């Protein structure tokens, strides 16, 4: 071998299992979903999980102390019984049809089992649901041939394996959504710094100021950002989305998942475009 001859080494870092998320979403989601109790956080979460072609995944991992929530129960028992996203979403949207004469929802596990027995569904999404951080596998232990999605729902106890999902998860074919009641309660040096998608319900001024300082200030002034937040949050249960690394400002800031900045406030959109 000639030591003077340069080596021609080509390393392929391409993920053979690239996620096919919906247009205008990052190729791989590392999301923060922030909002106080009863703000409506479950609405975008279950929309992301259950609307077809929204997020691309076939293995779901949920860490939550609220697994008894009926939507979680439907997802857990639904996927375990091979129901599809559409099947589970239909249950949620038609909940009244599955209630007893007393107005009580039929047992969800029995509901899913009965539906599966009658229809022989062909859903292929697998699921793991746990209520303690130590039961979550390290991302290195995930099957990288799967398209993994992990939900961390109001986890008060921080563990290294949770943090690793935001620092290493994308290298192990895993997307993540971290749910918290406060932006400032999310660990900064690890999870906050590595997120690329923020879903923000009405926040207190401290959180708004910090998000502007850490993410938004290169695009608009603090006053403009406050105005944008107020325009979105003027109705209950509405939320602002920031697609952190989207270079198209019209789609970087959205009212909900799909309403772009230009449709929220054209004057603000024109102003910040003049500055860029």
Protein language model annotation of sequence segments:
Residues 1-20, 67, 79:
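N-terminal pre-Walker A segment at the start of P-loop NTPase domains
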Residues 11-13, 89, 125-129, 239, ...:
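Generic preference for hydrophobic/aromatic residues in regular secondary structure cores
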Residues 17-19, 29-55, 65-76, 94-223:
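Conserved P-loop NTPase motor cores
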Residues 19-35, 55, 146, 197, ...:
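P-loop NTPase motor core of the ASCE superfamily
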Residues 60:
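An amphipathic, basic-hydrophobic helix/alpha-beta surface used to engage anionic
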Residues 79-93:
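Acidic, Ser/Thr-rich peripheral helices and adjacent loops at domain boundaries
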